[in-house]
From Swiss-Prot:
Transmembrane segments: none annotated. NCBIfam families: PRK00010.1. HAMAP family: Ribosomal_uL5_B (MF_01333_B). The lineage of its organism: Bacteria, Pseudomonadati, Pseudomonadota, Gammaproteobacteria, Enterobacterales. GO terms for molecular function: rRNA binding; structural constituent of ribosome; tRNA binding. This is Large ribosomal subunit protein uL5. GO terms for biological process: translation. GO terms for cellular component: ribonucleoprotein complex; ribosome.
Length: 179
């Protein structure tokens, strides 16, 4: 079992129960899923770019990504409906906890000029979204084999009812928020 999951069950739950005055363990917010999304707009011209992005996402997450397609045609972007324009992975369970641990302890500190993550990126329901400009912050990516530096969106979906609960949950995991 992932060490972050053990930490959540052993320490974070009791800490959050005291902080918010919950009566039951089931009321405590928990991380439900983590979604990684990589938009590859240049895939319109070169399909190989999407394959490389999918390979990067597979290496990072340990799971085969779903190819996302354009929902509608946009002439300005030269996109037609149904064109493959990105890929995404939804992590749950054990893989989610392993990825979350690597994200907090290894990947985020490797971000260039890192001064902490914005605490304003909550959506109003306790879910946190962040953007990463380079996929090379993850140790699974071999720097020499990268054809192009790509960014990705990382969304951490929680069962928290408010942003304060979500922020407290992530802070319990030592999530590096900007002061």
């Amino acid at each position: 079992m992932a060490k972050l999951h053990d930490y959540y069950k052993d320490e974070a739950v009791s800490q959050l129960m005291k902080q918010f005055g919950y009566h039951s363990v089931m009321q405590v917010p928990r991380v439900e899923k983590i979604t990684l999304n990589m938009g590859v707009g240049e895939a319109i011209a070169d399909k190989k770019l999407l394959d490389n992005a999918a390979a990067d996402l597979t290496a990072i997450s340990g799971q085969k990504p779903l190819i996302t397609k354009a929902r509608k045609s946009v002439a300005g972007f030269k996109i037609r409906q149904g064109y493959p324009i990105g890929c995404k992975v939804t992590l749950r369970g054990e893989r989610m906890w392993e990825f979350f641990d690597r994200l907090i302890s290894i990947a985020v500190p490797r971000i260039r000029d890192f001064r902490g993550l914005s605490a304003k990126s909550f959506d109003g329901r306790g879910n946190y979204s962040m953007g990463v400009h380079e996929q090379i912050i993850f140790p699974e990516i071999d720097y020499d084999k990268v054809d192009r530096v790509r960014g990705m969106d990382i969304t951490i979906t929680t069962t928290a009812k408010s942003d304060d609960e979500g922020r407290a949950l992530l802070t319990a995991f030592n999530f590096p928020f900007r002061k």
